Amino acid sequence: MPISVSNRRRFTLGHAPDASPSRASLLPLFLVTLLFALAPFRASADVGVILNESLDESMDRITGSGHMAVYFSRICADTPTKFRLCAPGESGSVMSTYINIGENHSFQWNIVPLNVYLYGVEDPVNRPLFASYKIKHALEERYRQNYLAGLCDTPACQTSNKSEWREMVASTLIRGMYLFIVDTSVEQDRALIVEFNNAPNENHFNGATNNCADFVRRIVNTYFPHAASRDVLNDFGMTSPKAVARTFTHYAQRHPELNLRVMHFAQVPGTIKRSRDVRAGTEQLLRSKKLLIPMAVFAYEALPVVAASYVITGRFNPEKEFEKHPATNLAPENLASSPHLQSVALQDQRTQIVGASAEWNNYRKAFDTEIEENRDSPEALDRSHFFKLLDEKGTASVGSDGSAWMQLSENGGSVSVGVSASNVLAQESDPQLAYSLLLARTSALLKSPKHRRETMLEFHQEWANLQRASAAAASARNPAPSKLARLIPIEASATF
């Protein structure tokens, strides 16, 4: 779902107002206060660490350590290798280091716009709703042409999947991530800009002593000395992404004036393999069968030590931190127009952002009931295999704004379906294919565990889009409108 993180606005963090019999009379004043708090004025800045989930590739397949990057709300990319302060309305940036960025020069780091990092597009309204490598590669090529002129001229950079600049484009298509954010100052940002713009950008990546987590740790400690550190015991002397996220979070909790917020970006449903939870070193030894079994056989005497080390000092659950300090990635204008704004204002906003288990269960039951009642429709029948069929038979393309399309051959002709938030219900998008796509997407979201799905506020918008798609598909088929076209009231519960 969209993120509009203006450099002049904080992420929205909820707190539960006191309930009272006069809440109806206080609602207008409360909404004015809420919207004023969300207004695009801000005098300070933010920095955050991004904990990226683990991919089943390379050394990550063994270590399960994932990846780490750093987020700035007031620092933007002048080029992928140069900082500047953001202009009003810009959404900040993400900076990261890799083993091999793969560009003409061996750079240590690149910096990209936040929404490009998350979705592969500048405006999140054009974010993809369907994850496939065809779409991701099309977004990568668009990014290369628009941003890497003069930096990516070699055949290896342009065509090799080993060039890791690609991981900084539409990352949510390949992995989920958590963003831990605190307040900083513009003065701190200016100092960092001067430091990095004047320092050599030379790659010295080393997995043991100078990896992505070391890189983020040093940047965070520039803002807040000793805020992030390695876990020598649980990561065997190295720095892991999870250790940096854990120590940074604990530091922020000891300093409430930093206003800790946590955001969760779920991996986009589709045909790309699901990413995995990030793990510390001892945690991976205990949870990975391919490591635990050999250890139990050949080094069984060390197993109790490893278990005790992890249980006592190494545990950290990003999802629980999100539930404690949730921030929404919905922009103020989306909140203001949301039919759920009143309930967000008057109920526990943490529950409203994360979603109560009872509310999710009610949506699952409603979805299953409606699918059963419409089981004869082709869209309902195809939903379990739709992603695979769309990926296998479709040809991906992206427009100048990054909005993605899939074109399929049909009866000697072709038909197109929009696979971005901005075009899935467009006039040019086939209504029945669009409905099938949103059915498959909704089904995947509702089947996902809580650490694999988006927020409840975002899902409310998903449900509204599904209703519109249902009505459009029913009109195209010309039968009676689908029962999914009505809004199903869901009562929230405070139980997770």
Annotate each language-model stretch with its function.
Residues 51-52, 72, 207-210:
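Short His-Asn-centered micro-motif
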Residues 58, 62, 68-70, 75-79, ...:
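Soluble extramembrane regions of membrane proteins in the secretory/endomembrane system
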Residues 1-23:
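N-terminal secretory signal peptides that target proteins for export/translocation
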Residues 49-58:
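N-terminal post-signal-peptidase region of extra-cytosolic proteins
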Residues 39-45:
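Sec/Tat signal peptide C-region and signal peptidase I cleavage site
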Residues 46, 66-67:
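Short, surface-exposed beta-edge/turn micro-motifs
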Residues 25-39:
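Bacterial N-terminal signal peptides
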Residues 140-184, 189-496:
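Activation targets extended, charge/polar-rich intrinsically disordered C-terminal tails
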